[in-house]
């Protein structure tokens, strides 16, 4: 049986960090107000020379080094982003070129904050059917470009960044208890909630980019239930439950949502990876940034059972269960 394993991970952040106190100098807010409601202390903001593509390239290079591979070993690049460098071609193709890859194929996936989960699941499907041997999966976003910096309910939440993972096909023998890699994945979407979290513009409507708009309370109201339901489905598909979990790596949107979801799933706080305090919500980069952090600091070890999850505009949401 073919399983998809994550052979290497990497991340990249812009050079400039922006603390809550610095933000309060030009936005009507305060460190206390932001921390109490979100758990965020700072975020990273891209400068004019830092883009979704440039951050994605750096994260990809770090993941390749971590995996002990070169770009010649990669068959496909999948980029999850909602903030591409251009309307077209795909930013994944720009990353492919920047990495010196002129073989295989590359494309973008747009599922907002759920993007990395959707991209990783797509890559897993390619590996299982034999369409590729190794895939570079990247989540990269520069949400600072689409924020209304006069709207304190949204501009305090988001940051820029990128994360990447090298997904590799591996032949596995034995039952699920002896297997590693992606054990199960579940994806969901429902367009009935489009107006809860969106960008008010686009090439086909306004011919402009627009700004991010969000009904925060409404998103929170739905988020916890949707996240926990899809996580439970993911556990069930693998014949497991939350009591067996070693690490919960959620989308870093808001500390309140993370804590409420973990509590409902009966996952103790010491098993939850939280980086939202340092990065803010980096959209598609959120999960791979958190995963890379927990791997680099030694928390996640070989054999650990890990649940990744995310929810984003649309709504889109999903979860992936992995044996490391």
From Swiss-Prot:
Locate the region ACP-binding.
252-256
What GO cellular component entries does it have? Answer: cytoplasm
Q: Per UniProt, which keywords does this protein have?
A: Acyltransferase, Cytoplasm, Fatty acid biosynthesis, Fatty acid metabolism, Lipid biosynthesis, Lipid metabolism, Multifunctional enzyme, Transferase
Q: What InterPro entries would the database entry show?
A: ACP_syn_III_C, ACP_syn_III_N, FabH, Thiolase-like
Q: Where mainly found?
A: cytoplasm
Question: Cross-referenced Pfam families, in alphabetical order?
Answer: ACP_syn_III, ACP_syn_III_C
EC number(s) recorded for this UniProt protein: 2.3.1.180
Please name the top-level EC class of this enzyme.
transferase
Q: In which pathway does it act?
A: Lipid metabolism; fatty acid biosynthesis
Could you mention a single GO BP entry for this protein?
fatty acid biosynthetic process
Kindly list the places in or outside the cell where this protein is found, as annotated in its UniProt entry.
Cytoplasm
Q: From what superkingdom does this record's organism come?
A: Bacteria
Is Metal-binding there in the keyword field?
Answer: no
Q: Which GO terms describe its molecular function?
A: 3-oxoacyl-[acyl-carrier-protein] synthase activity; beta-ketoacyl-acyl-carrier-protein synthase III activity
Catalytic reaction equation(s): malonyl-[ACP] + acetyl-CoA + H(+) = 3-oxobutanoyl-[ACP] + CO2 + CoA
For this protein, the record's SUPFAM superfamilies field holds: Thiolase-like
The record's annotation in PANTHER family points to: 3-OXOACYL-[ACYL-CARRIER-PROTEIN] SYNTHASE (PTHR43091), BETA-KETOACYL-[ACYL-CARRIER-PROTEIN] SYNTHASE III, CHLOROPLASTIC (PTHR43091:SF1)
Q: What is known of its domains?
A: The last Arg residue of the ACP-binding site is essential for the weak association between ACP/AcpP and FabH.
The cross-references to NCBIfam families, in alphabetical order and at most eight, read: fabH, PRK09352.1
| Job of this protein | Catalyzes the condensation reaction of fatty acid synthesis by the addition to an acyl acceptor of two carbons from malonyl-ACP. Catalyzes the first condensation reaction which initiates fatty acid synthesis and may therefore play a role in governing the total rate of fatty acid production. Possesses both acetoacetyl-ACP synthase and acetyl transacylase activities. Its substrate specificity determines the biosynthesis of branched-chain and/or straight-chain of fatty acids.
Q: Which family does it belong to?
A: Belongs to the thiolase-like superfamily. FabH family.
HAMAP family in the cross-refs? FabH
Protein known as = Beta-ketoacyl-[acyl-carrier-protein] synthase III
Look up and give the organism this protein is from: Bartonella tribocorum (strain CIP 105476 / IBS 506)
Gene name linked to the record:
fabH
